[in-house]
Amino acid sequence: MQAEFKSSINDFLEQLPNHARLYQKPAACLAVFRLLPILARQYVMSMLFNPMPVALSDFDLWIKLSSKVYQSESFNKLVRMHIFQFDGQYITLNSEFRKQFITALTGGGNHNSFGVPCTDEDKHLVTVDFLDAYAKETWETILHFMVGTPEAKFPGEGVLSLLKRGGLMSGPKNQLRITRAGFQFLLQDINAQIWTLLLDYLKLSEDTHMDPVQVLHFLFMLGSLDLGRAYSVDFLTDTQQIMLEDLREYGLVYQRKITSKRFYPTRLATGLTTDYRSLHGKQSENDDDKGFIIVETNYRLYAYTSSPLQIAIIGLFANLRARFSNLVVGVITRDSIRRALMNGIAAEQIITYLTTHAHPQMRSNVPLLPPTLVDQIYLWELEKNRLRATPGILFRDFLTDSGFDQAVEYAKELGVLVWDSSLKRMFFITTTGAQPMIAYLKRRAVK
């Protein structure tokens, strides 16, 4: 999942029309560097303190012939990101990127690119544990709302708008339901989830006339801040102060009050450009990350978790029968799978979820999940897809066979006939043929 998130943000960065402005901030250059493939990073570092162009042939000496494909991928990425400039023979490092990246590494300049820490002590003690708890509660409020947890809190208006705009939920405002894309979102690690929403936020910023480069600068700045340290609001631009209010709703930053002149980045923010994947301070402490689901051949499911979020997700495709302090027992049935399918969740997504969260005890099984269960879930999906709903109008109660046959022939000529039964003197047409058919029957009645 981490590779997917890196691919998405890199794709967005490649499409930016003006990279010169993006690379004017040291924090942005550092963040972009962290998002590059490993070999691309190596090439950047090898040229960083060398102002002279390097011949393409010289790079060939650094790698084995069998690794040529990786070199090509790295070069293409660096050129598309406008970090490398290639004239067909020599490669030069972007001068602005070089300058600002060196500043980021050496700590020089007076640019406030990495935020301005508050010098006075906060009267209200804010600890790392508090920030972790705040971020976890705020982010899981969004996830609980998506899966429809009973009595779940409503996220802010900005979050609701983004969930719908990004296709993660659909329906009227007071009846939003998770979509197939939304369930896929739940399968991602925490960092990929956050970047999914932030990329939608970046696209939305263009519609609201916010500068996407300034938005990126602020996100990259957050990724370079220190967890547990307070930073001043006064040095932020107008765009960044608007963003600060929005990002509070995602749990990326904490402010005691809206008018507070200081803010604290949470672990969700400081991990934006790293491989951070958990809401917990130590990833190893999260049992859910290790796998907690056991599935039997009789379709019974045992989930060793106390997480309300994971229990709610399982409830999307299984009937829960019993719940204990750290164990939930359920069963996967035709009705529970059909319910999930009706919500837009695919069979493959359910199987992926069960595989991803399989208990270590199941890891020795080959295949990991019972084949009978996997096959049955796919069969239930095929059963649903075999039935197709077509909106239209049913015509019936014809007095004679000839009148019925002539009406059916007319519907066929129009190309709107869906179904007919001469035995019952009934036929069904699409809505597009309703008006012509009604007019035809009226003409017949006049005769």
UniProtKB/Swiss-Prot annotation:
Its main location: nucleus. It comes from the Eukaryota. Keywords: DNA damage, DNA repair, Nucleus, Transcription, Transcription regulation. This is General transcription and DNA repair factor IIH subunit tfb2. GO terms for biological process: nucleotide-excision repair; transcription initiation at RNA polymerase II promoter. It holds the Pfam family Tfb2_C. InterPro entries: Tfb2_C, TFIIH_p52/Tfb2. Component of the general transcription and DNA repair factor IIH (TFIIH) core complex, which is involved in general and transcription-coupled nucleotide excision repair (NER) of damaged DNA and, when complexed to TFIIK, in RNA transcription by RNA polymerase II. In NER, TFIIH acts by opening DNA around the lesion to allow the excision of the damaged oligonucleotide and its replacement by a new DNA fragment. In transcription, TFIIH has an essential role in transcription initiation.
